[in-house]
UniProtKB/Swiss-Prot annotation:
Name of the protein in question: Ribose-5-phosphate isomerase A
Classification via InterPro entries: NagB/RpiA_transferase-like, Ribose5P_isomerase_typA_subgr, Ribose5P_isomerase_type_A
GO biological process: D-ribose metabolic process; pentose-phosphate shunt, non-oxidative branch
Assembly notes: Homodimer.
Keyword terms: Isomerase
Pfam families per the UniProt record, alphabetical: Rib_5-P_isom_A
Highest taxon listed in the record's lineage: Bacteria
Catalysed reactions, as listed in the record: aldehydo-D-ribose 5-phosphate = D-ribulose 5-phosphate
Pathway: Carbohydrate degradation; pentose phosphate pathway; D-ribose 5-phosphate from D-ribulose 5-phosphate (non-oxidative stage): step 1/1
Similarity comment: Belongs to the ribose 5-phosphate isomerase family.
Catalytic EC class: isomerase
Gene name for this UniProt entry: rpiA
GO annotations of cellular component type: cytosol
Length: 223
């Protein structure tokens, strides 16, 4: 199977996993990116079986609405049973790097609200140590240079992602050359830098379940 077929397989597996737990009042948290898009497409076939969704980005909200799935603001929702999203990297503890699509802050907020965070990815995303994929950091624009200097002190090589503004109006620094042995600790250190909104490490709140698309089918890993 090619990469898109693997993504379709894990997206369908996620729908199959959550459907038995949904009812007419259920609201599903939905992530951002190519794998999440496959999940939206698969979920849309069952839109009569749940109430609606909370989107982690404007792009996701647009795709959900195009499928006729109601989109709710998170502030109007008391709880989310599930949040389903992809990842740029995952280790075996289901600590993740996310944010390749620049939606990391809203993704992290929705994940924090959800009872169960299901990550869907193809097998290439599972790594022994995080950091080969550059770590995205969302930054208040005026703090870009200050934050970059602090990230260098932490051992990284930050690169400004030109031409990209997040849905929150901020910029992204992609931090290269990090070997992330202690994801929770590094997540906290980067978030403590003045001017940082958040970073793409999902370690303090990792995924609960990883559905991994492989040539031999979908494998399930639990935290």
């Amino acid at each position: 199977m090619n990469q898109d077929q693997l993504k379709q397989a894990v997206a369908q597996a996620a729908v199959d996993h959550i459907l038995p737990h949904l009812d007419s009042k259920s609201i599903v948290g939905v992530g951002t990116g190519s794998t999440a898009n496959f999940f939206i497409d698969a979920l849309a076939r069952h839109k009569a079986e749940f109430d609606g969704a909370v989107a982690s980005s404007e792009a996701t909200a647009k795709r959900l609405k195009e499928h006729g799935i109601p989109v709710y603001e998170l502030n109007t929702v008391s709880e989310l049973e599930f949040y389903v999203d992809g990842a740029d990297e995952s280790n075996e503890r289901l600590e993740l790097i996310k944010g390749g699509g620049a939606a990391l802050t809203r993704e992290k907020i929705v994940a924090a609200v959800a009872k169960t965070f299901i990550c869907i990815a193809d097998a290439s995303k599972l790594v022994p140590i995080l950091g080969q994929f550059p770590l995205p950091v969302e930054v208040i624009p005026m703090a870009r240079s200050h934050v970059a200097r602090q990230l260098v002190k932490l051992g990284g090589d930050p690169v400004y992602r030109e031409g990209v503004l997040t849905d929150n109006g901020n910029i992204i620094l992609d931090v290269h050359n990090l070997r992330i042995d202690s994801p929770v600790e590094l997540e906290e250190k980067i978030n403590a830098i003045v001017g940082v909104v958040t970073n793409g490490l999902f370690a303090a709140r990792p995924a609960d379940l990883l559905l991994l698309g492989t040539a031999d089918g979908v494998k399930t890993l639990k935290a």
